[in-house]
Design a protein with these regions (language model features):
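Carbohydrate-associated surface elements
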Residues: 194, 215
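A conserved mid-protein helix/loop that constitutes part of the nucleotide-sugar donor-binding site
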Residues: 18, 234, 238-257, 269-272
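Membrane-proximal helix-turn-helix segments that form the acceptor-binding/catalytic region
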Residues: 115, 128, 144-187
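Nucleotide-activated donor-binding/catalytic signature segment of Leloir-type glycosyltransferases, i.e.
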Residues: 272-292
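N-terminal subdomain of nucleotide-sugar transferases
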Residues: 1-43, 116-119, 253-256
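Conserved acidic donor-binding segment of nucleotide-sugar-dependent glycosyltransferases
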Residues: 342-354, 361-367
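Short hydrophobic beta-strand element within catalytic cores of glycosyltransferases
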Residues: 327-330
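A charged, aromatic-enriched C-terminal amphipathic alpha-helix characteristic of glycosyltransferases
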Residues: 75, 353, 367-396
Length: 398
């Protein structure tokens, strides 16, 4: 088959980008012809189809023209249509596989593919289709008000705590609504059962929702298998974005009361403030790590912690940890329980107050874990081959 993968960016920026790049390699290894569509950006991987990419826009533009251009992209997809049509005409895809496309690109790509009779598959990495501000959070609390009435994003200033930004998010949601998106899309891939249930609550038909967990890329698999396991440190780690919805400050508060070494691997808007605030010797900020450095960290620590306060979908950080044979302590929220309830060495928590005692318990219990067995089981569960077979089933659905 000829498959066109669409994502906002084409470099190792976040989980959606990692998934898109891994999917490309998986499908090419299976003998398919694959190309990309993204927004032009200086850090993108260079490929032949770069010439068709959408013009770059900035949401931090200060001038009126830049703001109008950004708003026009969000509401109407201005700057996307012409080149995407050209790519469809030249590449002639059998399947267009969408990932994160709102704002920097546009859902108009689903419409254009649909109008040409091309099958559209859409992997959902966040809750944008039912929550205009992506995260189902309002004032640090989970919120589902917009599942049935999008005006709440404006009333509560959910987007960046700004009326203009929230009005724009409302306009985007009203234009690219569930009726249009359901018509243009053959199947939505929900990486967790939790997400599929929330999509149904938001009005999307169950018949269009298929649950397939994310997978780990072949390059990562080989590195995990071929890298010797070091002696485990009496240390644990948080690996991910340093932003409010990730709940990392809850973990840092707990770590400040404990003697164990905590590695913080990641960057984001809270990075500078957290570094200033948490200066204890047992808390080590590593910054953003590449894929291979992440694996090496996972192999040497005792366990990871996922303290997210939002509805985590199917976090790659959990999958990568499990595939390295490293247990996980995760908040009982979103799709996290689906990933970690398969082993007695993993634990769930609900309240921040539980963290200090549970972290101590984790250190006491993981010492008896057979890391090789845990890794082997996870690598099989989250293999590319398993994902590919499920993907073929979805593509075959009408």
């Amino acid at each position: 088959m000829r498959i066109l993968i669409v994502n906002k960016f084409l470099y190792l920026r976040g989980g959606d980008c990692v998934h898109s790049l891994n999917l490309k390699q998986l499908l090419r290894n299976a003998g398919h012809d694959v190309c990309f569509y993204a927004m032009s950006y200086s850090q993108n991987i260079v490929c032949e189809e770069n010439k068709y990419f959408a013009e770059e826009i900035s949401f931090s533009a200060k001038d009126l023209q830049g703001k109008i251009k950004a708003a026009s992209r969000i509401i109407w997809g201005i700057g996307v249509v012409q080149n995407f049509k050209k790519l469809l005409e030249e590449f002639q895809p059998d399947v267009v596989h969408l990932n994160n496309i709102h704002s920097y690109l546009s859902p108009i790509v689903a419409k254009l593919a649909y109008q040409r009779g091309v099958k559209v598959i859409w992997t959902l990495h966040d809750y944008k289709l039912i929550c205009p501000s992506y995260s189902c959070l309002c004032k640090r609390n989970t919120c589902e008000a917009c599942f049935t009435d999008k005006k709440h994003v404006v009333l509560r200033k959910c987007m960046k705590n700004s009326f203009p930004a929230s009005i724009l998010a409302w306009g985007e949601a009203m234009n690219w609504n569930k009726n249009k998106l359901s018509l243009w899309t053959n199947s939505f891939i929900c990486p967790s059962q939790f997400m599929a249930e929330k999509m149904q609550q938001g009005g999307y038909p169950a018949s269009k929702l298929q649950v397939i967990s994310n997978f780990i890329g072949e390059e990562q698999v080989q590195y995990i298998i071929n890298t010797p396991n070091p002696i485990r440190e009496e240390a644990y780690a948080y690996i991910g974005r340093l932003s409010q919805e990730k709940g990392v400050e809850s973990l840092l508060k707990a770590a400040s009361r404990l003697p164990y070494k905590l590695y913080i691997a990641g960057s984001g808007p809270l990075e500078a403030d957290l570094k200033k605030k948490y200066t204890a010797n047992n808390i080590i900020f590593l910054g953003h790590l590449g894929i291979m450095d992440t694996i090496e960290l996972l192999k040497k620590i005792s366990f990871t912690v996922i303290p997210a306060i939002w509805y985590e979908n199917n976090p790659l950080s959990v999958i990568e940890s499990l595939c390295c044979g490293t247990p996980v302590l995760g908040r009982n929220i979103g799709g996290i329980p689906e990933l970690i309830e398969t082993s007695s060495f993993n634990r769930l928590f609900t309240q921040d107050e539980e963290l200090p005692s549970l972290i101590t318990k984790m250190f006491n219990t993981v010492v008896s874990a057979n890391r090789d067995e845990l890794s082997t089981a996870a690598l099989q569960r989250f293999s590319g081959e398993h994902y590919y077979q499920k993907w073929l089933e979805v593509v075959g659905k009408e």
